Amino acid sequence: MGDRFENLPDWQQRFVMEYEELANRAEKLHAILTKYDAGVLDFTPQTPIGVLRAQLSIMWAYMEILEERAEFEGVDLSILADPEE
C-alpha cells in the first residue's frame, strides 16, 4: 500500500485506494476517448463509443460522490497528489 497510507485507519486506506484506482481508470478511459475523437486511436474498440462515454460519465460522477463523502468523513484525498506538483 505504501508509506503514504500507513497512518490511516484500514477503512480510510480502502477508501483512498478505491478513489485512486477509479481516478486512474477514468484517466485511461478518457485518454482512449480523446484519441478516438482525434482519429488517432491505434485500435478499434469492441464496445460502442457511446457506451464508453456513458461509463466515463458515471465514473466521474462516482468520483464526485467519493470526494463529497471524503469531506464528510474527514478522509484526506490530497494524500494522492503528486508531491512534485
Place the predicted regions along the sequence by residue.
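Extended, charge-rich alpha-helical interface modules
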Residues: 2-85
